[in-house]
């Protein structure tokens, strides 16, 4: 096997994401004629500690959301540094990209520029070897297909409705394969649409393909999902569990949690009580961002009360950053990390965060963003690292479905080697 292949060109362009905002797409060309491509996602609710996504700010073009500066940074500064490098030396290339930027948040060149290049390099290397990306990144032991954490009711920043919490999801832990898991979720999704219609609710979709009805309360979102699970022929708490992304930083104001649509203002301790009541009442297996990104004491209390029963996922809390993750591990905040490639900005740093989480006994959930493209890198990544869980929206809208279809292909390619761990994917809890 050739272990040295030069990069001969790097080309970036501005494309559109699923929310009709510009994003960066990068192509890396190799001396043997191989090309690798990657497109960068973008978030709606973003953590304050995320790597910086460079936007042009020109209000006359795409409402200031253009990314031509990031594109130019790739085509000029980054391309000049990358041409002649060995495509198979991913750690070196990622280190060089970080040093080329020179800031601690990738604010000079832009995390969207840097990530696009990092992922395009990995794709080019895999293509040159004739390997699937998951095999190139994960090696021969890459074999675990993920339990989907499927967002089927959208609220918060992902929808214009009366639901405070951002995402209500289903997890088909009772399936025996990813193929079966996807079918189960699709059946519940269609049943939920009919259930909402029967109740007189609108069935318009949010950013991630979930329904965005004007429900009477946050709890009604869970009630109607459980009803749909039952009507679809499955058992809530056995075949399927509920997962929640509270995105609580979005309604954390002056040290309090303001649930406007319920007319409640809660302290950290009261917010923990709120979730504990839900966990005792409903078949909830995972809560993401239950507390705000700055409320470390609240996170610690939440973990003390619920950490043995429920997966507690840090998204805004950790932003895929090893420094923040290390602090969380030290003080006992959360027991899981959400992994978003564009929060940190390179493939190598992402893999480092996953490794640190696993060493500490944390699960890692590989995630999309609300602004997505047809890029399927995260589908390969979740199998490459045997994470066992993926969060990539509803089984609707092609930018979400593309990820699920890629996982079907991977499961087919792995054949008998493929593993679907179901409830065993939650090795961090005893429920």
UniProtKB/Swiss-Prot annotation:
- Please give the chief subcellular localization of this protein: cytoplasm
Check the record and name the PANTHER family matching this protein: ENOLASE (PTHR11902:SF1)
Cofactor(s) the protein requires to work: Mg(2+)
**Protein name according to UniProt:** Enolase
Give the EC class as a word.
Answer: lyase
Q: Name one GO cellular component term.
A: extracellular region
Q: Which gene encodes it?
A: eno
Q: What is the lineage of its organism?
A: Bacteria, Bacillati, Bacillota, Clostridia, Eubacteriales
The pathway to which it is assigned is:
Carbohydrate degradation; glycolysis; pyruvate from D-glyceraldehyde 3-phosphate: step 4/5
Query: What SMART domains would the database entry show?
Result: Enolase_C, Enolase_N
Alphabetized CDD domains for the sequence? enolase
Q: Which residues form a coiled coil?
A: none
Assigned protein family: Belongs to the enolase family.
Q: Give the EC number(s) under which this enzyme is classified.
A: 4.2.1.11
Q: Which PROSITE patterns match?
A: ENOLASE
Disulphide connectivity of cysteines: none
Q: Which UniProt keywords apply?
A: Cytoplasm, Glycolysis, Lyase, Magnesium, Metal-binding, Secreted
Q: Name one GO molecular function term.
A: phosphopyruvate hydratase activity
User: Which Pfam family, giving just one, matches this sequence?
Assistant: Enolase_N
Q: Where does Mg(2+) bind?
A: 245, 288, 315
Checking InterPro entries in the record gives: Enolase, Enolase-like_C_sf, Enolase-like_N, Enolase_C, Enolase_CS, Enolase_N
Q: Which reaction does it catalyse?
A: (2R)-2-phosphoglycerate = phosphoenolpyruvate + H2O
